Swiss-Prot record:
The keyword Ribonucleoprotein is annotated on this UniProt entry: yes
GO cellular component, one term: mitochondrial inner membrane
Family: Belongs to the bacterial ribosomal protein bL9 family.
InterPro entries: MRP-L9_N, Ribosomal_bL9, Ribosomal_bL9/RNase_H1_N, Ribosomal_bL9_N, Ribosomal_bL9_N_sf, Ribosomal_bL9m_C
Gene: Mrpl9
Transit peptide (residue range): 1-49
GO terms under biological process: mitochondrial translation
The species this protein was found in: Mus musculus (Mouse)
Protein name: Large ribosomal subunit protein bL9m
Transit peptide keyword on record: yes
Domain of life: Eukaryota
Length: 265
């Protein structure tokens, strides 16, 4: 059973169709003029994309100087590739300033086009990697290596500085012998506890000798440029536990957490 249309809806439909026939379409697409009645806003731009197709039926060869004769079947195509699904290429830029998690000045980076255009280029943090810009920054790097320009922190150095600012070092010392903390011991604990390789000459401890347990500090200089003060706790040395003992502790903890089965009656 067909659905009936209300008389009011039918009247509105016929009125709209009549308005379109009488020039309403031109009115819709007419450009907006200042001071006149507001027009309609339409996006008339086409979606720009490329689709690769090939003919389903091969076109027979034609004679020399003649065009091939196409039949209806030769206008049937099959889709080979839609280029909008291709992975988008990155944008190569040269940084003019240090940017967190991307690089430092002079680094050639490859980023997404959205990041490069909306963040780096628009804020003056990078320039396009043109041959002229590449040559300019290569000359700047060579001058820095020769010592004619001030050195800047490397990307790894900036990451190290950021990591050390959030660290707390714990140094274990025994109580059965006399000891005095020195940069060599602190450097070993940096590598053992934090996984950071620190040269002893890059460490600076308090002037007063450290011979007791307590809370102290140490200064770490990264690449001779940035210095970070790391809080340090000197505590009682505890012998590291073996893997077998840790496995046994985990089993005991699992047994204590597991629910006990009720006894059958």
């Amino acid at each position: 059973m067909a659905a009936s249309v209300a008389p009011g809806v039918r009247t509105l439909w016929w009125a709209g169709a009549a308005w379109l026939r009488q020039g309403g379409i031109r009115e819709l697409f007419r450009p907006r003029i200042e001071g006149s009645t507001p027009g309609r806003d339409f996006s008339l731009s086409h979606y720009q994309s490329t689709v690769i197709v090939e003919r389903w039926w091969k076109v027979p060869l034609a004679g020399e100087g003649r065009k091939p004769h196409l039949h209806r079947r030769h206008r049937v195509y099959k889709l080979v590739e839609d280029t909008k699904h291709r992975p988008k290429d990155n944008l190569e830029l040269i940084l003019t300033q240090s940017v967190d998690e991307i690089g430092v000045r002079g680094d050639l980076v490859s980023v997404k086009k959205s990041v490069g255009r909306n963040k780096l280029l628009s804020q003056g943090l990078a320039v396009y990697a043109s041959p002229e810009n590449r040559k300019l920054f290569e000359e700047e790097k060579s001058l820095r290596r020769e010592g004619k320009l001030e050195k800047i922190q490397t990307k790894a150095g900036e990451a190290t500085v950021k990591f050390l600012r959030s660290c707390h070092l714990e140094v274990g010392m025994k109580n059965n012998v006399k000891w005095e903390l020195n940069p060599e011991i602190v450097a070993r604990h940096f590598f053992k506890n934090l996984g950071v390789v620190v040269a002893p000459h890059a460490l600076r401890l308090p002037e007063e000798p450290i011979t007791r347990w307590g809370e102290y500090w140490c200064d770490v200089t990264v690449n001779g440029l940035d210095t970070v003060r790391v809080p340090m706790s000197v505590v009682l040395f505890q012998k590291p536990k073996t893997k077998r003992y840790k496995h046994w502790l985990a089993q005991q903890a699992a047994k204590s957490v597991a629910p006990t089965n009720p006894q059958a009656v």
